[in-house]
């Protein structure tokens, strides 16, 4: 059952279940809403790199962090079209693109709309991650055919000030509301391993699950600790705790795609398998995610083959009582 009235007590109870009980519960929910041996495969391109004015502690592209990243200006339409075509050729179904800036500028809206149209012409779903978005901008992107907009909450409201101070939590929620009001599917999740507590993870999922409409996609990232960022020495999130979060996300948002996003490059096959069993059913494909390494295509092909999991487009997975 899809709910928007979860409580913190209920959420913490899920996190506190014995591991096997939690995974069993999540897996049964997953089977109710999705075909359980299928995953959605997405690609992610960086259309503008570095120099972002936000001070996100985890980000290699923040102008506040000394990571040595080379800046790159806004891509051309043909560059985006070529990247989308290459992604389609290797089996990707959704092409996502992101820009390192605080918000979408009005002067760039037309160019972004051209990106969306180019991606759609290749027969792919489109997703943009461009920072804060005004309602009228969201409406223009919807008219251009944008399918998804990504804007993560990153962590809980209570812990957020430890991670970002140049953008408020409410500003993030305002953008999500604008995207939903424009009729675009929301992609919204967070990052694990930034020093947050289990309650912070619960609060983050609670925020997402109690939106007026659940995000269509929920990316769960494992922190990639870049040298030169305030979080470069952060301790890696425990694997069992990561899988727990995947499972709780699946239970609380049963019809959403739960995506394994950044931080997969050092995940074992066994950890991937547990995540898929717990309800993860979407991955990013390709060796690079913005500025972070990703699992190689060869690793993913071998992994999915060994597990008997197949890559299928969005919508093909759904409503399977099996």
UniProtKB/Swiss-Prot annotation:
Binding site residues for [4Fe-4S] cluster: 52, 56, 59
Residues given in the record as [2Fe-2S] cluster binding sites: 96, 127, 187, 259
Cofactor: [4Fe-4S] cluster; [2Fe-2S] cluster
Domain of life: Bacteria
Pfam families: BATS, Radical_SAM
Domain Radical SAM core residues, every copy: 37-264
GO MF annotations, alphabetized: 2 iron, 2 sulfur cluster binding; 4 iron, 4 sulfur cluster binding; biotin synthase activity; iron ion binding
Annotated metabolic or biological route of this protein: Cofactor biosynthesis; biotin biosynthesis; biotin from 7,8-diaminononanoate: step 2/2
Catalytic activities: (4R,5S)-dethiobiotin + (sulfur carrier)-SH + 2 reduced [2Fe-2S]-[ferredoxin] + 2 S-adenosyl-L-methionine = (sulfur carrier)-H + biotin + 2 5'-deoxyadenosine + 2 L-methionine + 2 oxidized [2Fe-2S]-[ferredoxin]
Entry similarity comment: Belongs to the radical SAM superfamily. Biotin synthase family.
HAMAP family: BioB (MF_01694)
Subunit structure: Homodimer.
Function: Catalyzes the conversion of dethiobiotin (DTB) to biotin by the insertion of a sulfur atom into dethiobiotin via a radical-based mechanism.
Official protein name in the record: Biotin synthase
């Amino acid at each position: 059952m899809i709910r928007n009235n979860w409580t913190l007590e209920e959420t913490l109870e899920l996190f506190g279940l014995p591991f096997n009980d939690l995974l069993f519960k999540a897996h049964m929910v997953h089977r109710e809403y999705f075909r359980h041996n299928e995953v959605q495969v997405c690609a992610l391109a960086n259309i503008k790199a570095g120099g972002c004015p936000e001070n996100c502690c985890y980000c290699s592209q923040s102008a506040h962090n000394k990571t040595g990243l080379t800046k790159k200006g806004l891509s051309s339409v043909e560059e985006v079209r070529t990247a989308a075509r290459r992604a389609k050729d290797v089996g990707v179904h959704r092409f996502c693109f992101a820009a390192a800036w605080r918000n979408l500028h009005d002067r760039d809206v037309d160019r972004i709309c051209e990106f969306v149209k180019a991606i759609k012409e290749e027969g792919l779903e489109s997703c943009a991650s461009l920072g804060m978005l005004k309602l009228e901008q969201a409406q223009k992107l919807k008219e251009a055919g944008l399918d998804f907009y990504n804007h993560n909450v990153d962590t809980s409201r209570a812990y957020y000030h430890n991670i970002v101070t140049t953008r408020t939590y409410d500003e993030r929620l305002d953008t999500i509301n604008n995207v939903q009001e424009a009729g675009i599917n929301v992609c919204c999740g967070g990052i694990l391993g930034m020093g947050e507590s289990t309650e912070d993870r619960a609060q983050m999922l609670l925020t997402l699950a109690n939106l007026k409409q659940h995000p269509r996609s929920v990316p769960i990232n494992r922190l990639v600790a870049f040298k030169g960022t305030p979080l470069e020495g952060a301790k890696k999130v425990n694997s069992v705790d990561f899988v727990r979060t995947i499972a709780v996300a699946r239970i609380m948002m049963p019809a959403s795609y739960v995506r394994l996003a950044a931080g997969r490059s050092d995940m074992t096959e066994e950890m991937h398998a547990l995540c898929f069993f717990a309800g993860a059913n979407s991955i990013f494909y390709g060796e690079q995610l913005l500025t972070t390494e990703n699992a190689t295509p060869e690793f993913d092909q071998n992994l999915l083959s060994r597990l008997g999991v197949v890559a299928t487009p969005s919508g093909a997975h759904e409503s399977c009582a099996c």
